């Protein structure tokens, strides 16, 4: 199965924990069974990520029911290591300007109402469900507990470090930014060239072609990959070369070397 291939590959890569991200899905039972089999710990997010949520009674009731169902379903797996309330919701509210934007453009009262819903879900409902149905497993209300650029992010709780990529810092930054627990970091690459060929024609062999751009979901994606390749690998990426297609396969392959370099350094 795809799960078997993925999780056995994680073990072969010497990984010991898998995070089920709050912007995804609660996984199928077979996923947790295979994590048990392979000895992989599971960091399990509840399915909340990168957004504020309603606080009306019907929504809060549905949150409670969904949490109870999944906690009861997953709790018996020895691979389960942690329940986490959400991905980046608190960090975004406090540090990405969300709260201040609401206060400035609407009102303090509306901001308070929005955060009251946050408090209800992540500090009351979910901890109560864990306390009642899975007291043996720890609960962490939000990941990360701080934000990139804030000193406390490296000394308290877990961290998501995106100075590399979003901040375009060199990979060597990772040698200095060492938090207590790094729960998220990353960098993009293009897929294997054999995969790229399945959705392109030779006339599309330009990372800024319409086809390549339509497969790039990050606003800074292709330009950031290109900047790091020129910085770290001195790949010649003039528009003339790209239009001719001469360098396109090497361009794609070089982006994968960047990922290799980052993972080797970070892990």
Identify the meaning behind each predicted range.
Residues 1-51, 59-82, 213-254, 258-262, ...:
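Active-site-adjacent substrate/metal-binding segments within catalytic domains
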Residues 12-13, 43-45, 67-70, 106-110, ...:
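Glycine-rich loops and low-complexity Gly/Arg-rich segments
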Residues 24-26, 48-50, 88-89, 145, ...:
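Active-site-proximal loop/turn and secondary-structure-junction residues that shape catalytic pockets
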Residues 83, 90, 121, 128-267:
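Substrate-binding clefts and catalytic carboxylate motifs of secreted carbohydrate-active enzymes
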Residues 34-37, 53-152, 251, 262-263:
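Active-site neighborhood of glycoside hydrolase catalytic domains
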Residues 30-31, 93-96, 192-194:
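Short, solvent-exposed loop/turn and secondary-structure capping segments
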């Amino acid at each position: 199965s795809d799960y078997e291939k993925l999780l056995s590959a994680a073990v072969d890569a010497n990984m010991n924990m898998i995070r089920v991200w709050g912007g995804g899905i609660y996984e199928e039972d077979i996923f947790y069974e295979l994590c048990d089999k392979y000895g992989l710990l599971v960091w399990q997010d509840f399915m909340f990520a990168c957004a504020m949520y309603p606080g009306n009674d019907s929504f809060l009731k549905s949150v409670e029911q969904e949490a109870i169902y999944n906690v009861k379903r997953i709790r018996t797996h020895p691979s389960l290591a942690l329940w986490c309330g959400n991905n980046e919701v608190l960090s975004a509210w406090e540090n990405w300007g969300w709260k201040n934007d609401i206060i400035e453009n609407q009102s303090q009262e509306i901001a308070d109402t929005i955060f009251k819903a946050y408090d209800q879900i992540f500090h009351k409902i979910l901890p109560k469900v864990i306390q009642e149905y899975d007291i043996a497993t720890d609960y962490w209300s939000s990941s990360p507990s701080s934000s990139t650029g804030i000193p406390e992010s490296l000394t308290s709780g877990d961290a998501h470090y995106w100075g590399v990529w979003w901040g375009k810092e060199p990979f060597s930054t990772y040698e200095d930014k060492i938090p207590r627990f790094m729960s998220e970091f990353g960098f993009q690459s293009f897929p294997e060239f054999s995969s790229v060929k399945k959705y392109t024609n030779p006339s599309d062999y330009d990372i800024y072609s319409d086809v390549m751009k339509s497969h790039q979901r990050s606003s800074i994606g292709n330009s950031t990959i290109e900047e790091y390749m020129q910085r770290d690998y001195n790949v010649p990426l003039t528009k003339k070369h790209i239009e001719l297609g001469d360098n396109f396969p090497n361009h794609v392959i070089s982006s994968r070397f960047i990922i290799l370099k980052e993972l080797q350094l970070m892990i």
